[in-house]
Structures are given as structure tokens and as C-alpha cells.
């Protein structure tokens, strides 16, 4: 979802909503729109009355689509009524894997709709707050960590009717590498990663 609706100073204008709906309408019409992701920043806290108004407005405005919300501050998982509110509105609470700090949302959140939605950001704790949009996600999950994530996905798949899982550790192609690994672990069919072929006039180094 576009940043103006979920960013640090979120403002939802009818003009922006109309333009956004117009842009994704072909995807929705032809059944190619899996779900909308509303990603809120770590500073988006439940005890902030403005934040709760924005969350409600996003759900009300885009409720005609399958909607998943990424709430990253622990106040949301510490609160008693977050899960109930999302369940009442049939909104998926995104399961996040990322470095954990005192302010982080809980590692495990309940399933709040018939759709499970996972985002794996990597665990680069050292660069999480001081890195840029590239180095923050410089993290390749180990085979042991892939098994851990696969188990979480498997448990959710037994309860949900629809499931999405995305790797966001996009440094130098780490995400597709880990995606293939978890699909192999879960014994899911997938296409092999394409191997870059040299151009006809490109020098190929001798092995």
C-alpha cells in the first residue's frame, strides 16, 4: 500500500484513494491481486490515539480487498484487544521475522483471519537501526533458521485457507535463495532459479 496512508504522518485523502484503486483495479478484476499489505513503521504505537484512528481508517477505506496489516511496535501485541479488533474486521495480522528489541512486536501473533501472511526481514541486528535500506536487510537465513521458519509456516497453513510468505532480505539476491530453500523444506513445487547465460560476444572466463 502507498506510504502516505501508513507512513510516519499518514494522511488518507479521497484523491489518493481513488488513484490507488484505479491503479490496482485491473489486478483485482482478473483475480491477480492476492492481498494488500499495510505496513506501519515501528513508531506506530497502539497507545497513540491517532494511530488507532489511522488503522481504523485504513481498514474502513480498503476493506473491500483482502488486507494484511504489519504492526511492528510491541504495544500492539501487548494490548488485549488488538487480535479481537482484527478478527472482527477479518484482517490478517502479519507474522514478522526480524531482529528483536525491547520495542519489537511479539515474534508470534495470533491468526486473525482465514489468511496467514508472513514477512521475513532477516535478523541483521547490528545494522537494523543504523543501516540503510540495503544493508539493513543484508542477512542470509541459515538452514537451521529456514527449518524454524518452515515450521511456523506449516503450523499456520493447517489453520488458514490462504497463506503468503515473503522474504524481504533482498541484499544481493538473498531473498530468492532463501525462498527456494524454504520451498524445498516444505516440499513445495517451484521453478529453478534461472542461470545467467553469457551473450554471444561475451568473454567467458576459463575454469
Q: Could you say what each language-model-derived stretch is?
A:
Residues 1-207:
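Residues lining hydrophobic/aromatic ligand-binding pockets adjacent to catalytic sites
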Amino acid at each position: 500500500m502507498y506510504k502516505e496512508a501508513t507512513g510516519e504522518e499518514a494522511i488518507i485523502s479521497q484523491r489518493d484513494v481513488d488513484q490507488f484503486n484505479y491503479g490496482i483495479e485491473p489486478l483485482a478484476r482478473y483475480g491477480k491481486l492476492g492481498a494488500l499489505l499495510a505496513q506501519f513503521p515501528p513508531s506506530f504505537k497502539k497507545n497513540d490515539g491517532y494511530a488507532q484512528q489511522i488503522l481504523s481508517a485504513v481498514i474502513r477505506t480498503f476493506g473491500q480487498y483482502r488486507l494484511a496489516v504489519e504492526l511492528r511496535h510491541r504495544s500492539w501485541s501487548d494490548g488485549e484487544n488488538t487480535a479481537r479488533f482484527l478478527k472482527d474486521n477479518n484482517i490478517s495480522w502479519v507474522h514478522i521475522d526480524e531482529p528483536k528489541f525491547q520495542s519489537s512486536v511479539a515474534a508470534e501473533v495470533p491468526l486473525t483471519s482465514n489468511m496467514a501472511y508472513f514477512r521475513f526481514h532477516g535478523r541483521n541486528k547490528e545494522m537494523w537501526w543504523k543501516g540503510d535500506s540495503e544493508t539493513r536487510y543484508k542477512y542470509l537465513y541459515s538452514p537451521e533458521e529456514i527449518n524454524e521458519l518452515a515450521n511456523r509456516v506449516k503450523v499456520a497453513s493447517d489453520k488458514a485457507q490462504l497463506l503468503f510468505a515473503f522474504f524481504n532480505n533482498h541484499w544481493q539476491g538473498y531473498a530468492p535463495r532463501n525462498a527456494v530453500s524454504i520451498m524445498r523444506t516444505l516440499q513445495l513445487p517451484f521453478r529453478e532459479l534461472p542461470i545467467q547465460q553469457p551473450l554471444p560476444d561475451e568473454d567467458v572466463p576459463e575454469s
